[in-house]
Amino acid sequence: MNLLPTPESPVTRQEKMATVWDEAEQDGIGEEVLKMSTEEIVQRTRLLDSEIKIMKSEVLRVTHELQAMKDKIKENSEKIKVNKTLPYLVSNVIELLDVDPNDQEEDGANIDLDSQRKGKCAVIKTSTRQTYFLPVIGLVDAEKLKPGDLVGVNKDSYLILETLPTEYDSRVKAMEVDERPTEQYSDIGGLDKQIQELVEAIVLPMNHKEKFENLGIQPPKGVLMYGPPGTGKTLLARACAAQTKATFLKLAGPQLVQMFIGDGAKLVRDAFALAKEKAPSIIFIDELDAIGTKRFDSEKAGDREVQRTMLELLNQLDGFQPNTQVKVIAATNRVDILDPALLRSGRLDRKIEFPMPNEEARARIMQIHSRKMNVSPDVNYEELARCTDDFNGAQCKAVCVEAGMIALRRGATELTHEDYMEGILEVQAKKKANLQYYA
């Protein structure tokens, strides 16, 4: 029996070599490795093992450094949180400066810190009347700051920690009407023309600004409502505030007359600044004649202060652009004593007169104020309107109230025509014989 191995043919050996090369290529083993001897491969393997150990130690070191950095960041975040819970020192930003990185380094210093800074620096003035230069602004983005901003700074490092809301006079904040009036245009009788003029001048530019832009016209800056007392000026302003979603600021003319010099002018400035911040907004100035009287020579300090307040109002009326969402409504019953500078075009452009109601308007007013009452069907409002000659809107409402009180006094369940007639007599008895509204 022959146990000797049979010699392989050259073709079989070549096929095996080709198979080995194919498997090496599939495994990613290069031709260089295949040509290496066993000792060289062992040596190469040891080198790779040592490199792997070095890389593992490097990864471990970087992991420890990362954990240390995370701990440091957490510690610094806790410190920042503690600093932000401490009381702030209120300051004002006076100026923002750009640092030029191309400035030459200062002599005599190994490292010039000023030349390495980039970005913005700030100059602030604290509430203790001290001015500081901040090379590093702090935790607030420098792009969001502007001169005049109110900021809170750390009392030790003076770094800016947070921006504070703009400060306004507390009296101006109280002028903002929080609760919307409930009046509607349908609650106003006999003033259809005045309602249309007010809507065109105030409401349309705020709600449909594109209509004015398409025509290329500028809407009026403000409206002056004038007429005798009791004709519905303040009522129409309240209805306008109820129908628009704008912020409504109500100023009374006597509020702007203050004892200290410049106090009234500051109130006017703060009111317009608050209106601009909360735009769209409407500023209603009632009793404008308290500060808008004609200027005259006077040695009294009080008269000069009133004139200063009016000049500030003129400045604010000229100051804001007509396309902004801030509108002014002024009301007075003494238009004859107002300063001509207030009445010129470009300030209070639209002037709306509120005359005494005619017979039809008086009937409509009494119907409006009687619609919630239990009224008898035989009440003739046209006859009541003829009997209330020279009555204004407020007196027509007083007639309805007096009629209700008379019916209540006699224990009735509904109001009759005679109750209204007695109410007219009651109001006429209280009315002065000679009531002059204009000089």
Curated annotation (Swiss-Prot):
Source domain of life: Eukaryota
Residues that bear N-acetylmethionine: M1
Residues where Phosphoserine is found: S9, S376
GO CC entries: nucleus; P-body; perinuclear region of cytoplasm; proteasome accessory complex; proteasome complex; proteasome regulatory particle, base subcomplex
UniProt GO MF annotations: ATP binding; ATP hydrolysis activity; identical protein binding; proteasome-activating activity
SMART domains cross-referenced by the UniProt entry: AAA
Annotated function: Component of the 26S proteasome, a multiprotein complex involved in the ATP-dependent degradation of ubiquitinated proteins. This complex plays a key role in the maintenance of protein homeostasis by removing misfolded or damaged proteins, which could impair cellular functions, and by removing proteins whose functions are no longer required. Therefore, the proteasome participates in numerous cellular processes, including cell cycle progression, apoptosis, or DNA damage repair.
Protein name according to UniProt: 26S proteasome regulatory subunit 6A
Organism expressing this protein natively: Rattus norvegicus
